[in-house]
Amino acid sequence: EIDKLNKWLFENVNNAVYRAQFAESLQAFADGYETFFTGLDAMEERLADKRFLFGDYVTDSDIRLYTTIARLDVSYSRNIGPCKHRLVDYPNLWGYARDLYQIPAFRHNTYFKDFAASVDLNEADEEYWENTYYDIVVQETDWDTIWKTPTGRESLSKDPAHKFKAEK
């Protein structure tokens, strides 16, 4: 089941946003864009009664979905044009993303400032740094405080004290 969902996530979420972003025709853009947001809609619905994609514990599928949704508002939204929805417009996905962010391995490997940069910051030329969005919005936003806001999603779990099956 995990492998099946991972394949679906790749086709309908993880790669769909890139198909829109790097499309070479309007039709290819529209296909990627619609597939991406339809995929997010499906995940929003799936997470309505589950803490994580397969219930009580984090799986590989959760990691795969998180890597895309963590970038939605700070990166992808600027690269694919007006978005149908922001992450916060999906209450289940937004709470789910923040719930995962509470886990140190997620939090310590989520680099919002890097996600917001449209180039490798180590190779950016001087002109790149004259970027209002990056200089003001990204630098002055307290991402950690926003994302560490409690979610209450533990109430969806039969084992709320544990996020990983191995912790039992």
Task: Give each language-model segment a name.
Residues 1-168:
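C-terminal alpha-helical interaction module
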